[in-house]
């Protein structure tokens, strides 16, 4: 078969007819194809109905696409494949995907794809996305060179926009049973406010290098390492630079070890932990002493936390400079302890020699919370510095058998 088509038109019903005849297991017309509206093609067609080469222009209600593609299908195997070049200008991508965050897209790409029924598609992409609208901002100059396979992407993505550049190279797969991440990211002078990613940080820029090689979909499942180098934040009235931060997670004999090392914070957690069940663990222990105040949840949450933690705080400039948290720790402070769901035991012990929260200056701060026997107790000691002196505060609280006693001295 060979021919030149001055115009081949298909309505939405016509598109449905084609889908029904090309599909191995027809379950109706996909919504994304229905949104195309009326479809027309002008150009050249050659080959067979199941193996067609097309060259020309495809017009839909959402925009036009220039293409030079080979389309193949095998209905018995549920296979649909394509390869070639596609190009479009200001195509209404948001309407096609029914996503209000997206707008129009302009690209020139080489594509190779295979779709098999009941399997994730395999798509290779190489070329340039000249522009794409996201969150009311038009991103420019995105280079793609990679493969989408088994729900993940392996390759390179580079953004070279007036409001920042981002380079990604590696493999990311969040669709696998155990998510995997192995990539390098270089962020240079990204302005998140101007990119409409946040309402914060006007006139601020971020730069960093991030290398990740780990598995797991959450902190307590993570095995591997994340390394952040040269984090730089600049704004008209403030700046921050962090040389390095390393997060390493390992697992031995069924117990996790998570370590964070940086110039402002060093922390380690060892044992069995699930961060999303930690609030439930705390409430379960406290409920033992004040059951009338802390009622059991309608749907009990299983908790199996049994871990030690040790945190050393050296500098909190990152909190006040980047996150606008009005907390400053002036000297080495510590927070350590343990949780044990099986034994219903906890201990939290902290020492803060000198810190400031908003306009409050505190020295000799100490906190202790533990339940060594048949009661739970908390102690707080601190000195609140004033312009005309200082106030020493002491708080002791204890709970047992639904009774709470508190003593405050100053």
Regions found by a protein language model. Name each.
Residues 1-410:
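Interface amphipathic segments
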């Amino acid at each position: 078969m060979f021919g030149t088509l001055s115009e081949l038109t298909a309505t939405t019903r016509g598109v449905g007819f084609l889908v029904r005849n090309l599909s191995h297991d027809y379950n109706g017309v996909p919504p994304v194809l229905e949104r195309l509206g009326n479809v027309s093609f002008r150009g050249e067609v050659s080959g067979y109905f199941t193996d067609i080469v097309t060259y020309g222009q495809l017009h839909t209600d959402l925009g036009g696409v220039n293409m030079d593609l080979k389309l193949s299908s095998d209905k018995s195997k549920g296979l649909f494949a394509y390869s070639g070049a596609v190009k479009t200008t200001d195509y209404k991508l948001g309407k096609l995907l029914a996503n209000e965050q997206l707008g129009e897209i302009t690209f020139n790409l080489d594509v190779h794809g295979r779709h098999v029924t009941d399997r994730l598609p395999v798509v290779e992409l190489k070329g340039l996305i000249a522009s794409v609208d996201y969150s009311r901002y038009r991103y420019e100059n995105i280079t793609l060179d990679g493969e989408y396979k088994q729900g993940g992407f392996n390759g390179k993505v580079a953004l070279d926009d007036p409001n920042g550049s981002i380079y990604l190279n590696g493999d990311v797969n969040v669709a696998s049973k155990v998510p995997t991440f192995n990539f390098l990211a270089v962020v240079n002078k990204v302005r998140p406010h101007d990119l409409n990613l946040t309402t914060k940080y006007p006139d601020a820029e971020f730069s960093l290098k991030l290398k990740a090689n780990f598995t797991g979909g959450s902190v307590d499942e993570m095995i591997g390492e994340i390394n952040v180098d040269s984090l730089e934040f600049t704004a008209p009235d403030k700046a921050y630079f962090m040389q390095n931060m390393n997060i390493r997670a390992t697992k031995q004999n069924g117990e996790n070890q998570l370590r964070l090392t940086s110039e402002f914070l060093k922390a380690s957690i060892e044992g069995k932990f699930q961060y999303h069940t930690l609030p439930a663990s705390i409430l379960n222990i406290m409920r033992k002493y004040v059951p009338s105040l802390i009622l059991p949840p309608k749907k009990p949450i299983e908790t199996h936390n049994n871990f030690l933690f040790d945190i050393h705080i050296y500098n909190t400039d990152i909190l006040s400079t980047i996150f606008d948290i009005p907390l400053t720790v002036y000297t080495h402070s510590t927070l350590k302890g343990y949780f044990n769901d099986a034994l219903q035991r906890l201990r939290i012990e902290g020492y803060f020699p000198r810190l400031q929260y908003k306009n409050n200056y505190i020295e000799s701060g100490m906190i202790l919370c533990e339940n060594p026997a048949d009661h739970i107790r908390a102690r707080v000691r601190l000195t609140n510095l004033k312009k005309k002196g200082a106030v020493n505060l002491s708080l002791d609280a204890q709970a047992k058998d639904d009774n709470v006693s508190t003593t405050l001295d100053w």
